[in-house]
Amino acid sequence: MDLSRIPPQPKAGILNVLIEIPAGSKNKYEFDKDLNAFALDRVLYSSVQYPYDYGFVPITNNLADDGDPLDGMVIMVPPTFPGVATARPIGMLQMVDGGDRDEKFLCVPAKDPRYTYVKSANDLAGHRLDEIFEFFRSYKNLFKKPTEFFGWKGDVAGLPLVEECVKNYYKTYCKNDHGK
């Protein structure tokens, strides 16, 4: 699978999120570049499970310099399977995970008319945001990895981050004019 062929933003205000983990799973899969496949990274051995579909935005390299792409959670019912979800970001959870900056985009499916009214994370029922926050607050407790939170940002605040992370990806991995 050549992930470099999947654009991070097919059009303004839309992200491609490559789903690695369906909602309800306790198994954390990550795309392994060497295997060119999804591989089991670890099992969440606490009582938590992923509340919504989870994956990453291709051709991005986050600014924490850990080599990981930007993360995205897509509120999709029912859960899907690994593949590309065209999604509209409605917010971004700002956090530090294990000492590294680690933003999480919160998205809704771009092609689901049930979410046309949702323009920001604040348009969701408060319980949904609490559920997502609680998942990220506790999912690494038994791994003894601390997490810190700095709150939610609206969708407009997150999109410049995507552009920065695309540039960082090309600068890190391609060493050509794309990163300028």
From Swiss-Prot:
GO cellular component terms attached to this protein's record: cytoplasm
UniProt record, GO biological process: phosphate-containing compound metabolic process
Binding site for substrate: K28, R42, Y54, Y139
Keywords for this protein: Cytoplasm, Hydrolase, Magnesium, Metal-binding
Residues engaged in binding Mg(2+) 1: D66, D71, D102
Binding site for Mg(2+) 2: D71
Name under which the protein is recorded: Inorganic pyrophosphatase
Lineage start: Bacteria, Bacillati, Cyanobacteriota, Cyanophyceae, Pseudanabaenales
